[in-house]
Design a protein with these regions (language model features):
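Regulatory and interdomain segments flanking nucleotide-handling catalytic cores
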Residues: 1-351
Length: 351
């Protein structure tokens, strides 16, 4: 459906008398993307002018298709899959993580950074083909997992953040607190990733996050060789990306509407269970360091549980897409926003 030039040079429209007429489209009304190949960030408005980064050159469509085929075939071979065999879940995860990363060996210096920025539609080049595939996969999974084929947006946050950070008494405390919150954020996102896939998380983008890479390698069993060129594999110093607090304390995900509450409650349980396990391990190590028997000392464990009671707080909200429905279901037009307006009224002080 994509066309580098739109509208077309001619367009057929019905006249007042009902007859179809063919009209010429003037040049100023046409979008000729190849003459000004600029990619625009949908949020910041930042522009990436391809003409200033080597420009555009003719590339055979068949050549791109072949390189794409070889790239994804290579990922399947790395998983040990041949002729349709293998773990489909692993294949999805490998495609999601490494699909946008075309190696120089496979690229032959032709596409370079443009591979990651290829627009989904040159008529509106404000998002890449990978963004399009991420959203398509996320919604397809949510639709398929819901008995009514309905998706919902789930927004979830953990906290409180400021009091937790304010309790720090040194720079190392600040680093440890930020790192712990980032890890808690991942533990909150992990149940969603395990149930629906990491593509279901719309914000933050998880692709390339070192903590997520570790999960893909160690828990989802993607081959270590796929991560050989990742920055977090290159050194063990403090500058390793694994030591960075890379995740915020909130996320937005596309989930099956009927499972939104269940998923949110599962997230809350997972986060508090993980933190409690860490607390028990800390107490055990402290007791061992003090020369006490970790198995026969009850008071420190009880104190730790009391200190962590109710932490972290988990707040969430879910909005089903059914709040907006088309009145014309055949053509999917004439949207009815009454239910959405009613749901949003309290937030805008509307009676």
């Amino acid at each position: 459906a994509d066309r580098p030039q739109w509208p077309m040079e001619e367009i057929s429209v019905p006249g007042h008398d009902g007859k179809i007429r063919t009209l010429q489209v003037t040049p100023w009304a046409q979008v000729r993307w190849t003459k000004a190949p600029v990619l625009i960030h949908p949020l910041t408005g930042a522009e990436f002018d391809l003409a200033k980064h080597g420009g555009l050159s003719d590339t055979e469509i068949g050549d791109i298709k072949q390189r794409s085929f070889e790239h994804f075939s290579g990922l399947l071979k790395a998983l040990g899959a041949h002729q349709g065999e293998g773990d489909l879940r692993q294949a999805l995860l490998a495609f999601w993580r490494f699909g946008p990363e075309l190696s120089e060996e496979n690229d032959n210096g032709k596409l370079g950074a443009l591979w990651k920025l290829l627009p989904a539609d040159t008529r509106v080049p404000d998002h890449s083909i990978w963004d399009h595939l991420d959203l398509t996969s996320a919604f397809a999974g949510a639709f398929a997992a819901d008995p009514d084929g309905e998706a919902a947006l789930l927004a979830l946050s953990i906290g409180p953040v400021q009091p937790f950070i304010a309790a720090a008494r040194s720079t190392s405390d600040l680093w440890a607190g930020s790192h712990l919150l980032s890890r808690l954020a991942w533990e909150a996102m992990r149940p969603v990733c395990e149930q629906l896939g990491p593509d279901a998380i719309l914000f933050p983008r998880l692709r390339g996050v070192p903590q997520v890479d570790l999960w893909l390698r160690d828990q989802m069993n993607l081959p270590d060789a796929l991560f050989a060129q990742c920055d977090w594999q290159q050194g063990n110093t403090d500058s390793n990306p694994l030591f960075s607090a890379a995740l915020p304390n909130r996320f937005v995900a596309v989930v099956p509407a009927s499972q939104a509450r269940e998923i949110a409650e599962k997230v809350e349980t997972a986060v508090r269970t993980w933190l409690l396990d860490q607390g028990q391990e800390v107490v055990r190590r402290l007791l061992a360091e003090a020369g006490l028997d970790p198995e026969s000392t009850e008071v420190p464990y009880a104190q730790m549980k009391a200190q962590l009671a109710g932490f972290p707080e988990v707040h969430w909200a879910a909005v089903p897409f059914s709040l907006i429905v088309p009145r014309n279901t055949d053509r999917q037009t004439d949207l009815d926003t009454l239910q959405l307006s009613t749901a949003m009224a309290p937030f805008f002080g509307v009676e």
